[in-house]
């Protein structure tokens, strides 16, 4: 739903400021933990944060003085042109940056970036962007301000639209407008920056010769100021701003990108192309032209011709690539002029920094920064990440009877960094002579290993971004369970310490921190690229709204669905009957019963029931009964209200239900550090081009694309087609009207030198009065699996048929430990069955106990009457839940159990059958102090004396962790209470695929849907991810309480990793699961097993209780043998395995019949749900009578065999 137009009043502002601060006034600890700086350069990028880099009164949305124009009779008057914009979320330190700590100690990253730049053919910064440029050095600026160069740091804060203007030297410093502000209680000076176009009335274009003071465009009466050129600042902008944009847009001439973006800032009415005409393209064999890539579509064009049309296809692919890039740059300019509601973050409002004294605050900030390593690492480790979307492929026209019609899916982005070093061609496909000798890598990605060059390419060859990215990769520890000896970083470092490693970046002293050492440690997680396919893309973004529909049934029975047209009922009354409000009441009711704690639901913590609730077997049975009655009562009332009071079509509403969330396009929501801002911008470029590419075939259809003027002629058409897609289901936009809040415009007096004070005698004219502001990306996921429709194509039918088997619910009985109440059974096993452990072992063992029970191997003499009653209640509850369960997720706490149970009851009322629904899981990132010496190699800060000194040096780092606030590593925990995680307004990483389709008959508008999808890479991306088509994952890093106040998978290569091996052991079960798991991990990791923490064990087994027992085994080794060693651990395993079968029923001895321990038959237990709308509830476990006035016919219950058997094998 589009919002009503709003009016915003903006203050007039220069296009940017140069801040001058005393180095001693910088909060170097806080700044260093949020900055991006390479150890071999003093240049740095900082986040723009009030109280840290700018003053508390800093205004983000402004009307920029962008030029001048003549007015009045004879053109004798001057009016200033004003353009709306907002300030870029990053500040650029170009002088005195050495005071800021380096993000990583990895040496020579600038050299690494330049080597990758040369390999892939992107232009370097080697000379001023314009001719006859005169340097304005940092020392000169300090002298002009009467500041000491040795104690002063300078950085640029610039508006989003005009950052490229600074690079191309089309700006000047107005020293006369210098003002003093207060930042963190210290004085700072800031110099305003204005465009040189002020001196050139009526000129809406770049000045190609800004240093020509006698240019004819300069007004006769004006005193022209020297333009601002600082080589270090331009180098920094070249790397951080232009490099990532050039890689994302596939334009190797970075100056061309800068000039195009700068021109769009000056000419708001420009709709044509702005990228150079001589853009080059990467040579590779397109899917469309490659025989053997599937069916006949591989070589077929619209007219079915042969080689002639294959060449035409190559031209169309290259044309689609450059036109999509041009449109994306144009839309990025529109976004740069956008006005956003979110205020610039203030360091005083960060809860993470208010936890105590300075030391504690820095530790908290370092821990939070380490949390982000999970998200940033996912963007690096995922093969379909936007970081690697570097080429455009042509899938060819569609098959079938409509194959000749334009397709929205012909052109698409592919992840192919491995072909970036191929020869380059012009738009006609001719190889450029200076690249002809370069080796061409095949497009199928064979024999291509991930290297540092690819990482530098993903970073846009910016050493500052690469350093900060390594900052996060150095903290990626959880999940590295490859178990291969050659990946052990300690051994690699020891073996290579005294030899020459051909990386060209490090020496013996710097090798521990070298980027190649970090990549070697993580190389089993690095992405593997295969043949390009049209696939989802992995994106990074931020939830800036606390509202999402991520409960189990999504937006089922939402406010919009319940509200009747022309009904004057109060909105609050309608909201009370929605599914969302009902779930809130249910959770509140469980909290009042002291069964859950709402505060822990969003923390992905164990969320176990309080120990005071269960103190014996009777109280446990009462707990199960209480949970069951509460949930069934809430579901009954909810469905009765929908049917009787709301006349809601419950089955149709279920078919239309979606999980939904919104990712903000506000630049300040992702501005924690320069890398998060960089990832958000790369995401925007990828999403924009995905949408634009869908329209290219429609544009080319029936046209002669070989024409010289085709691109210039049709570029405005493509731009308009994209703008017509706004508010079409995916990208939302709002119309904003802007006005000027100041009566007079404060600007330099153009008739006097720049050292003179400004004047307020000018009038201002807003160039853009009304604009579209892009707000957010809408992501959705259907709750129900749809197995096809009448209008589906043959290819779609085949795809759905392949997925149906994954969604079909198997006909099998429940499993206790992996069932509805498995988490409660494991948590309270010691209370319920204190004797439930193998002989000779004093620790209660639920795996041993329930395995023997379900295999009918438990001696009946060991079970008391109370034990049997408890077992019966547990089995009955599990059976009843399993009979109606269509959610392919296992509850981990009472909150999840309540949500799943409630949703299953609703599904039952709606006659849902056969298929699982789509489930959501949030993987929440956390942090901890490292324990493994291999994880701290990058932080070794002393000289290593030989190979034998590597591990002692690492151990010294572990012993001094308390003195290093940045020494944390990332962890993962998962929860299925996704909405409560989304309430924390987190930064997220998800897979996204965008569907495009036309509306109803006669409607040619293109609608879109952002479909929640997966990340390629599976457990390499995150150890808690599973290849399961019925689940959708989101990686989340909460912001509430830290930096703000409360307010499917692709075809990646799958390996038999240790994690999969362990999961297989757990799924097979057995009386001593932890022994088998511990033995497998010990065999794979060896001595590293002793460093595994509970978080690591959870990452392996995805079971907190089993993880706790595994963690205790490490302590048991030390207790029994005095010290931990591999041999001692193996001896412990051997002793425990000897007791594995102990306690099982002996031959001829009576065994307890587990299958017969439930009084009611399965048919009776399931009928209790059919009678759920009865006015009176029967006692727990008894069949309920069906009332005569049932609301709707639920049909006969499914037939089940009278005896359910369980076999964990």
From Swiss-Prot:
<comment type="subunit">
    <text>Homooligomers. Forms double-helical filaments necessary for the formation of replication compartments within the host nucleus. Interacts with the origin-binding protein. Interacts with the helicase primase complex; this interaction stimulates primer synthesis activity of the helicase-primase complex. Interacts with the DNA polymerase. Interacts with the alkaline exonuclease; this interaction increases its nuclease processivity.</text>
</comment>
<dbReference type="Pfam" id="PF00747">
    <property type="entry name" value="Viral_DNA_bp"/>
</dbReference>
<dbReference type="InterPro" id="IPR043031">
    <property type="entry name" value="Viral_ssDBP_head"/>
</dbReference>
<dbReference type="GO" id="GO:0006260">
    <property type="term" value="P:DNA replication"/>
</dbReference>
<dbReference type="InterPro" id="IPR000635">
    <property type="entry name" value="Viral_ssDNA-bd"/>
</dbReference>
<feature type="short sequence motif" description="Required for filament formation">
    <location>
        <begin position="849"/>
        <end position="850"/>
    </location>
</feature>
<keyword id="KW-0863">Zinc-finger</keyword>
<keyword id="KW-0862">Zinc</keyword>
<dbReference type="GO" id="GO:0042025">
    <property type="term" value="C:host cell nucleus"/>
</dbReference>
<protein>
    <recommendedName>
        <fullName>Major DNA-binding protein</fullName>
    </recommendedName>
</protein>
<comment type="similarity">
    <text>Belongs to the herpesviridae major DNA-binding protein family.</text>
</comment>
<dbReference type="GO" id="GO:0003697">
    <property type="term" value="F:single-stranded DNA binding"/>
</dbReference>
<keyword id="KW-0479">Metal-binding</keyword>
<feature type="region of interest" description="Required for nuclear localization">
    <location>
        <begin position="1182"/>
        <end position="1209"/>
    </location>
</feature>
<comment type="function">
    <text>Plays several crucial roles in viral infection. Participates in the opening of the viral DNA origin to initiate replication by interacting with the origin-binding protein. May disrupt loops, hairpins and other secondary structures present on ssDNA to reduce and eliminate pausing of viral DNA polymerase at specific sites during elongation. Promotes viral DNA recombination by performing strand-transfer, characterized by the ability to transfer a DNA strand from a linear duplex to a complementary single-stranded DNA circle. Can also catalyze the renaturation of complementary single strands.</text>
</comment>
<dbReference type="GO" id="GO:0008270">
    <property type="term" value="F:zinc ion binding"/>
</dbReference>
<keyword id="KW-0235">DNA replication</keyword>
<dbReference type="InterPro" id="IPR035989">
    <property type="entry name" value="DBP_sf"/>
</dbReference>
<keyword id="KW-1048">Host nucleus</keyword>
<keyword id="KW-0238">DNA-binding</keyword>
<feature type="region of interest" description="Disordered">
    <location>
        <begin position="290"/>
        <end position="312"/>
    </location>
</feature>
<feature type="zinc finger region">
    <location>
        <begin position="503"/>
        <end position="516"/>
    </location>
</feature>
């Amino acid at each position: 739903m589009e919002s009503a137009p709003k009016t915003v009043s903006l203050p007039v502002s220069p296009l940017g400021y140069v801040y001058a601060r005393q180095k001693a006034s910088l909060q170097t600890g806080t700044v260093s933990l949020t900055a991006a700086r390479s150890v071999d350069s003093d240049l740095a990028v900082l986040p723009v944060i009030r109280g840290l880099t700018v003053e508390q009164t800093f205004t983000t949305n402004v009307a920029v003085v962008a030029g001048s124009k003549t007015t009045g009779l004879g053109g004798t008057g001057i009016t200033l042109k004003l353009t709306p914009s907002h300030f870029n979320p990053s500040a650029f330190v170009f002088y005195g940056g050495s005071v800021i700590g380096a993000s990583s100690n990895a040496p020579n990253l600038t050299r690494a970036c330049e080597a990758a730049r040369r390999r892939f053919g992107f232009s370097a910064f080697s000379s001023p962007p314009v001719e006859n440029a005169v340097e304005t050095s940092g020392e000169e600026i300090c002298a002009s301000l009467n500041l000491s160069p040795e104690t002063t740091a300078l950085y640029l804060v610039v508006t989003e639209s005009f950052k490229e203007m600074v690079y191309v030297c089309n700006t000047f410093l107005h020293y006369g407008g210098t003002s003093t502000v207060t930042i963190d209680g210290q004085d700072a000076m800031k110099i305003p920056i204005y465009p040189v176009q002020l001196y050139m009335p009526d000129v809406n274009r770049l000045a190609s010769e800004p240093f020509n003071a006698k240019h004819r465009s300069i007004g006769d009466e004006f005193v022209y100021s020297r333009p601002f050129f600082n080589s270090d600042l331009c180098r920094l902008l070249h790397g951080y701003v232009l490099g990532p944009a050039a890689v994302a847009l596939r334009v190797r001439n970075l100056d061309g990108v800068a000039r195009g973006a700068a021109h769009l800032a000056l000419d708001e009415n420009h709709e044509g192309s702005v990228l150079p005409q001589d853009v080059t393209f990467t040579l590779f064999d397109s899917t469309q032209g490659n025989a053997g890539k599937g069916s006949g579509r591989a070589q077929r064009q619209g007219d079915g011709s042969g080689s002639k049309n294959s060449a035409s296809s190559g031209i169309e692919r290259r044309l689609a690539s450059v036109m999509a890039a041009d449109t994306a740059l144009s839309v990025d300019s529109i976004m740069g002029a956008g006005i956003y509601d979110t205020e610039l973050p203030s360091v005083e409002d960060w809860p993470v920094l208010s936890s105590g004294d300075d030391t504690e605050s820095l530790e908290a900030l370092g821990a939070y920064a380490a949390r982000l390593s999970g998200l940033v690492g996912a963007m690096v480790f995922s093969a379909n990440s936007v970081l690697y979307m570097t080429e455009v492929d042509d899938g060819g026209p569609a098959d079938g009877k409509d194959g000749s019609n334009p397709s929205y899916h012909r052109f698409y982005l592919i992840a192919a960094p491995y072909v970036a070093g191929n020869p380059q061609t012009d738009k006609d496909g001719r190889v450029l002579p200076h690249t002809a000798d370069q080796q061409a890598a095949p497009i199928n990605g064979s024999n291509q290993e991930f290297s540092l060059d690819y990482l530098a390419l993903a970073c846009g060859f910016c050493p500052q971004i690469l350093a900060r990215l390594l900052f996060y990769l150095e903290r990626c520890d959880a999940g590295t369970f490859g178990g291969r000896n050659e990946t052990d970083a300690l051994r690699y470092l020891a073996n290579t310490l005294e030899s020459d490693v051909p990386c060209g970046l490090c020496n013996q002293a710097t090798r521990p921190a070298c980027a190649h050492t970090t990549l070697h440690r993580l190389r089993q997680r690095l992405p593997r690229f295969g043949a390009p396919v049209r696939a989802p893309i992995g994106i990074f973004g931020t939830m800036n709204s606390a509202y999402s529909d991520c409960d189990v049934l999504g937006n089922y029975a939402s406010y919009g669905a319940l509200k009747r047209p022309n009904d004057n009922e109060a909105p609050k009354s309608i909201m009370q009957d929605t599914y969302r409000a009902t779930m809130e009441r249910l959770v509140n009711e469980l909290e009042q019963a002291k069964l859950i704690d709402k505060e822990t639901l969003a923390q992905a913590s164990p969320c176990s029931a309080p120990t005071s609730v269960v103190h014996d077997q009777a109280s446990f049975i009462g707990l199960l009964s209480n949970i069951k009655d509460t949930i069934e009562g809430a579901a009954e009332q909810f469905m009765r209200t929908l049917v009787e009071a709301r006349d809601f079509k419950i089955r149709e509403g279920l078919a239309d239900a979606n999980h939904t969330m919104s990712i903000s396009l506000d630049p300040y929501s992702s501005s924690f550090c320069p890398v998060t801002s960089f990832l958000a911008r790369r995401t925007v470029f990828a999403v924009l081009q995905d949408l634009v590419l869908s329209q290219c075939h429609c544009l080319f259809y029936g046209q002669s694309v070989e024409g010289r003027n085709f691109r210039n002629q049709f570029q405005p058409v493509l731009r308009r087609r994209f703008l017509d897609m706004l508010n079409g289901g995916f990208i939302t936009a709002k119309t904003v009207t802007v006005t000027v809040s100041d009566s007079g415009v404060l600007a330099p007096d153009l008739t006097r030198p720049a050292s003179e004070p400004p004047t307020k005698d000018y009038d201002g004219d807003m160039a853009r009065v009304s604009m579209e502001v892009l707000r957010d990306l809408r992501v959705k996921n259907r709750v129900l699996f749809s197995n096809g429709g009448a209008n589906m194509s043959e290819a779609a039918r085949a795809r759905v048929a392949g997925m149906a088997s994954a969604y079909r619910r198997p006909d099998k009985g429940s499993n206790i430990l992996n069932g509805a109440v498995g988490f409660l059974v494991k948590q309270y096993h010691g209370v319920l069955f204190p004797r439930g452990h193998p002989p000779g072992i004093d620790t209660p063992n639920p795996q041993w106990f329930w395995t023997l029970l379900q295999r009918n191997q438990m001696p009946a003499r060991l079970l008391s009457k109370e034990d049997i009653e408890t077992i019966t209640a547990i089995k009955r509850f599990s059976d009843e839940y399993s009979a109606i369960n269509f959610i392919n997720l296992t509850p981990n706490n009472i909150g999840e159990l309540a949500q799943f149970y409630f949703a299953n009851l609703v599904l039952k009322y709606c006659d849902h059958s056969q298929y699982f629904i789509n489930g959501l899981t949030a993987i929440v990132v956390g942090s901890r102090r490292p324990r493994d010496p291999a994880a701290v190699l990058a932080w070794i800060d002393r000289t290593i004396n030989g190979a034998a000194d590597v591990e002692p040096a690492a151990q010294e780092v572990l012993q001094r962790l308390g003195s290093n606030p940045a020494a944390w590593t990332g962890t993962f925990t998962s929860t299925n209470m996704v909405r409560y995680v989304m309430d924390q307004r987190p930064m997220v990483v998800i897979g996204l695929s965008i569907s495009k389709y036309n509306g109803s008959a006669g409607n040619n508008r293109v609608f879109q849907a952002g479909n929640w999808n997966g990340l390629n890479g599976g457990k390499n991306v995150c150890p808690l991810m599973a290849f399961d088509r019925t689940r959708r994952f989101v990686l989340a890093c909460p912001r509430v309480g830290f930096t703000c106040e409360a307010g499917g998978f692709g075809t990646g290569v799958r390996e038999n990793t240790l994690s999969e091996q362990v999961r297989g052991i757990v799924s097979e079960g057995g009386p001593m699961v932890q022994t088998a798991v511990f033995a497998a991990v010990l065999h794979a990791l060896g001595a590293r097993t002793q460093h595994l923490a509970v978080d690591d064990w959870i990452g392996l087994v995805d079971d907190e209780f089993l993880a706790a027992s595994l963690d205790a085994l490490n302590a048991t080794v030390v207790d029994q043998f005095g010290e931990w060693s591999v041999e001692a651990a193996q001896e412990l395993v051997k002793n425990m395995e000897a007791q594995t079968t102990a306690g099982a029923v002996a031959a001829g001895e009576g065994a307890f019949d587990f299958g017969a321990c439930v009084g009611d038959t399965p048919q009776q237990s399931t009928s209790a749900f059919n009678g759920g709308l009865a006015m009176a509830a029967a006692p727990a476990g008894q069949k309920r009578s069906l009332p005569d006035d049932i609301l709707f016919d639920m049909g006969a219950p499914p037939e089940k065999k009278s005896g359910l058997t369980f076999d964990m094998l």
